[in-house]
């Protein structure tokens, strides 16, 4: 039950790129009593960061990003509608008529709806670009919007409450990309606390900011931690609703996804083989993917410190970068278990041979 509640809390938290504080507070409350936790000016959060000169063993960085896709107020119109820009990648077809929350200048959120044209007034194909949409917060003038505390630069997040569907063992909610990764790191760091002395590696957990707008936080966090090895935890888009069982590489309930390549990184082949061997040893279900598009913080991390062996492990997410998605608790638990087993199996000689 604790696991389910943690995932729900993280999914519900408001945290577009640059405004990740609510997410970080949840994680700090979960873990700050057992680890040293620190935050930098980029809003990256570090759990158990160990200075290089104090390390006795190779350091493995577990990394996820804390931000979610959303929007930001660009201007307030005379009639009180809010002009906005996207923060992160959105398809205009998945945005209209959805509920959102807008952060006011006193730290509260007020509800709104992204504008749409009723079917009665549609002309042509009815398609509308993001640049032509507005957020309606139920006011009728510029002054009313200002009185509500709306400002240029106010962040906007999807207004969605996460649910756990126990019969299907699925979560339905927003921002699983990448609150799922945040939850895994939180759980792993808790679970290994009493076993750290028996591991042959040091472990630091990192929640990086601003991934959705250009992998920015990870540039700073990987330079600060300077790890010997990195495991990036992600919630990549599932493809099992539109690909057959032979071509699908991101199916729900098919296990942890191991990524070979995407446009930002080719995974270290020896590291990938090691991961697959460990998964087989412990009978952990996994699937493999070769991605033609997308990218993760691994794209920046693997280039730091004269090259860091890095891999991306994912929990596939249906309908990523939209208001609502599904993730499987089974896949989450496969990923969690694999990360813990990797930490158990890794040692200095293995890492040197990657």
Tell what function each PLM region has.
Residues 1-354:
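N-terminal hydrophobic/helix-forming segments and targeting peptides
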């Amino acid at each position: 039950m604790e696991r389910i509640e943690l995932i729900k809390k993280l999914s519900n938290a408001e945290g577009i790129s640059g405004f990740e504080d609510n997410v970080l507070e949840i994680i700090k409350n979960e873990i700050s009593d057992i680890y040293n936790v620190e935050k930098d000016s980029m809003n990256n959060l570090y759990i158990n960061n160990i200075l290089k000169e104090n390390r006795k063993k190779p350091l493995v960085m577990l990394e996820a990003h804390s931000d979610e896709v959303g929007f930001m107020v660009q201007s307030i119109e005379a009639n009180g509608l809010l002009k906005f820009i996207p923060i992160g990648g959105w398809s205009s077809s998945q945005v209209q008529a959805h509920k959102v929350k807008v952060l006011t200048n006193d730290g509260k959120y007020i509800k709104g709806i992204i504008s749409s044209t009723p079917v009665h007034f549609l002309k042509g194909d009815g398609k509308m670009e993001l640049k032509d949409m507005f957020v309606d917060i139920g006011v009728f003038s510029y002054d009313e919007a200002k009185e509500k505390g709306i400002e240029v630069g106010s962040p906007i997040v999807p207004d969605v409450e996460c649910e756990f569907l126990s019969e299907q063992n699925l979560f339905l909610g927003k921002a699983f990309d990448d609150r799922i990764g945040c939850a895994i790191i939180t759980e792993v760091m808790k679970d290994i606390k009493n076993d750290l002395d028996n591991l042959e590696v040091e472990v630091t957990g990192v929640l990086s900011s601003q991934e959705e707008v250009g992998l920015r936080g990870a540039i700073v966090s990987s330079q600060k931690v300077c790890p010997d090895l990195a495991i990036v935890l992600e919630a990549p888009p599932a493809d099992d609703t539109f690909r057959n069982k032979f071509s699908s590489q991101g199916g729900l309930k098919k296990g942890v996804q191991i990524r070979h390549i995407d446009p930002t990184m080719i995974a270290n082949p020896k590291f990938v083989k090691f991961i697959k061997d460990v998964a087989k040893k412990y009978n952990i279900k996994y699937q493999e993917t070769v991605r033609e598009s997308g990218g993760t913080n691994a794209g920046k991390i693997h280039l730091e410190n004269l090259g860091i062996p890095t891999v991306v492990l994912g929990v596939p997410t249906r309908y990523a970068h939209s208001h609502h998605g599904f993730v499987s608790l089974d896949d989450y638990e496969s990923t969690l278990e694999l990360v813990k087993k990797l930490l158990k199996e890794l040692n200095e000689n293995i890492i040197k041979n990657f």
